[in-house]
């Protein structure tokens, strides 16, 4: 967790060993919801490296493999002899059992979905919980014999060993998934392991996170200056607010207004963010430049590349100006702040917290002579934690709870060429959708609601006494926790009716409103 030169973190650490299939991130989130810091590591990490992180506990995640299959991931040698409390979940439970001399086999009795389990209420994991409870299973293999010294603490109709423990060695295992919401006492099981078996302290709170990060940022940046590119999104805003609290006016934020934002967002960045943080802000009006570069382009990937290229060039020039101005005052600008989140770190294979900017995927392509050291104050946080940190820092709710918005902006929500006229049409429709969702109290229930203009499609309609040929608008409301998967949101019909009536009456050239009811997968959240 530490940055070179920064004070050691005061948080207890739980390592989640990732055996695949997206289970690890969910487990890590659930541990943090218990106010304990968690970090995901691969099963290939040597035990010595794990112990160097000073974990209070280790959790072995589920995974799609069979423990006895060739090439199946295993626990690193010596893991179960470290004395660190360990909880194995599903596949991790089976790895623990097999490694320590138990038996895992395919019994022919698989369990998928909700299952009733009978537990030993005098065991550490299940004390004070009902003897019979509902859990979520997802396994074909099963532990048929526990290792020596272990006690069976849970059974189902098809799994005679659904949980086990060796309390003297602080080793625990469950075949079910305590991290999923369908396991009715899953949080309690995790809390019993974290607080009682491992002695973890519930100190991973927003106040403590902010204090910890501010201290580490100050230690990293010292007396130097930093710059941050604001996109209008919550990640860059919270990252900038954290750094600004740490180093004050030695941070300069750059906001490139490419003209592709939604209604009122540019003004929100320029006014609300500065008012809330007092940060120094350099605004670059590049709307004409971006529209000129996008003229005649309809291919979505080409749009993305053009926008990325132009953004880099504009940001580069702004950065040069800031560096030059600082140089005149003998104050070097050595650091670039980015809003990288923990899922980005996990999916890219990790990182050491500081790297040269040209190697980072978020801002790749900056020229070689613009050398910065990265400051990534959010790289240990999930999205929901970032929002709570933003609230703790006093950022406006409209900014903190803003729906995710793509970097290329409205350009990839216009199916067809991007023009100033089409942007105005889409902005007006999008503003109505956001206003009505807010009025209905659905802001936080919906992950995001892209509004898509089918600019190259003409739809026949009747408005007034005449026939019209306008553009269709597509509403794409979805629910999600992390955008990896999503379901279409069941927005009440009366809200949809109000949105449709307002758009077709108030927005010129729109005569049809449609609803996208595709989940992800198979469809992505954005259309382009």
Swiss-Prot record:
Active site: 90, 177, 179
Binding annotation for ATP: 231-237
GMPS ATP-PPase domain ranges (all copies): 204-402
Pfam families found in the cross-reference section: GATase, GMP_synt_C, NAD_synthase
PROSITE patterns documented for this protein: GATASE_TYPE_1, GMPS_ATP_PPASE
GO MF assignments: ATP binding; GMP synthase activity
EC identifiers of the protein: 6.3.5.2
Gene3D superfamilies: 3.30.300.10, 3.40.50.880, HUPs
UniProt key word Protein transport: no
UniProt keyword list: ATP-binding, Glutamine amidotransferase, GMP biosynthesis, Ligase, Nucleotide-binding, Purine biosynthesis
Record InterPro entries: Class_I_gatase-like (IPR029062), GATASE (IPR017926), GMP_synth_C (IPR001674), GMP_synth_GATase (IPR004739), GMP_synthase (IPR022955), GMPS_ATP_PPase_dom (IPR025777), NAD/GMP_synthase (IPR022310), Rossmann-like_a/b/a_fold (IPR014729)
Enzyme class: ligase
Pathway it works in: Purine metabolism; GMP biosynthesis; GMP from XMP (L-Gln route): step 1/1
Reaction catalysis annotation: XMP + L-glutamine + ATP + H2O = GMP + L-glutamate + AMP + diphosphate + 2 H(+)
Gene Ontology CC: one annotated term: cytosol
Domain spans labelled Glutamine amidotransferase type-1: 13-203
UniProt cross-references to SUPFAM superfamilies, sorted A to Z: Adenine nucleotide alpha hydrolases-like, Class I glutamine amidotransferase-like, GMP synthetase C-terminal dimerisation domain
CDD domains assigned to the protein according to its UniProt record, in alphabetical order: GATase1_GMP_Synthase (cd01742), GMP_synthase_C (cd01997)
The protein's role, per its UniProt record: Catalyzes the synthesis of GMP from XMP.
Complex and partners: Homodimer.
Matches recorded under HAMAP family: GMP_synthase (MF_00344)
PANTHER family in the record: GMP SYNTHASE [GLUTAMINE-HYDROLYZING], GMP SYNTHASE-RELATED
Protein name: GMP synthase [glutamine-hydrolyzing]
Organism expressing this protein natively: Thermobifida fusca (strain YX)
């Amino acid at each position: 967790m530490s940055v070179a030169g920064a004070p050691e973190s005061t948080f207890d650490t739980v390592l989640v060993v990732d055996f695949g299939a997206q289970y690890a991130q969910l487990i890590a989130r659930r541990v943090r919801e218990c106010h304990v810091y968690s970090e995901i590591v691969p099963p290939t990490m040597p035990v010595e490296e794990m112990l160097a992180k000073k974990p209070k506990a280790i959790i072995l995640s589920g995974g799609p493999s069979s423990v006895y299959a060739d090439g199946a991931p295993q626990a690193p040698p010596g893991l179960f002899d470290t004395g660190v409390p360990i909880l194995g979940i599903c596949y991790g439970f089976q790895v623990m059992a097999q490694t320590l001399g138990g038996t895992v086999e395919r019994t022919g009795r698989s369990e998928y979905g909700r299952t009733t389990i009978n537990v030993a209420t005098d065991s550490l994991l299940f004390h004070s919980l009902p003897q019979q409870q509902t859990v979520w299973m997802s396994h074909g293999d099963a532990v048929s014999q526990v290792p020596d010294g272990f006690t069976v603490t849970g059974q189902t109709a098809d799994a005679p060993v659904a949980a086990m423990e060796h309390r003297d060695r602080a080793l625990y295992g469950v075949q079910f998934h305590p991290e999923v919401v369908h396991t009715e006492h899953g949080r309690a099981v995790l809390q019993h392991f974290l607080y009682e078996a491992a002695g973890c302290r519930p100190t991973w709170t927003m106040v403590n996170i902010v204090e910890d990060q501010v201290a580490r940022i100050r230690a990293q940046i010292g007396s130097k200056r930093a710059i941050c590119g604001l996109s209008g999104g919550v990640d860059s805003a919270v990252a900038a607010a954290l750094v600004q609290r740490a180093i004050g006016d030695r941070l300069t934020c750059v906001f490139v207004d490419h003209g592709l934002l939604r209604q009122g967002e540019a003004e929100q960045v320029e006014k609300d963010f500065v008012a809330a943080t007092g940060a120094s802000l350099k605004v670059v009006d590049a709307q004409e430049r971006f529209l000129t570069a996008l003229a005649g382009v309809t291919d979505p990937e080409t749009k993305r590349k053009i926008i990325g290229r132009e953004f880099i060039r504009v940001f580069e020039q702004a950065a040069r100006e800031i560096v030059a101005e600082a140089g005149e005052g003998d104050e070097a600008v050595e650091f670039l702040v980015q809003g990288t989140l923990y899922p980005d770190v996990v999916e890219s294979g990790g990182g050491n917290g500081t790297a040269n900017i040209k190697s980072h995927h978020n801002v790749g392509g900056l020229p070689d002579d613009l050398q910065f050291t990265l400051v990534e104050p959010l790289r240990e946080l999930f999205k929901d934690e970032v929002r709570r940190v933003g609230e703790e820092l006093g950022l406006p709710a409209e900014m903190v709870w803003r729906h995710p918005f793509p970097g290329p902006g409205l350009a990839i929500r216009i199916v067809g060429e991007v023009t100033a006229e089409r942007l105005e049409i889409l902005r007006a429709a999008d503003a109505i959708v956001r206003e009505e969702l807010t009025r209905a109290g659905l802001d936080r229930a919906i992950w995001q609601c892209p509004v898509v203009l089918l600019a190259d499609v003409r739809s026949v309609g009747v408005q007034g006494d005449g026939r019209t040929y306008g553009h269709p608008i597509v509403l794409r409301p979805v629910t999600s926790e992390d955008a990896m998967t999503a379901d279409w949101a069941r927005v009440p019909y009366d809200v949809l009716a109000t949105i449709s009536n307002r758009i077709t009456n108030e927005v010129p050239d729109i005569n049809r409103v449609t609803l996208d009811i595709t989940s992800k997968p198979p469809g992505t959240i954005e259309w382009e």
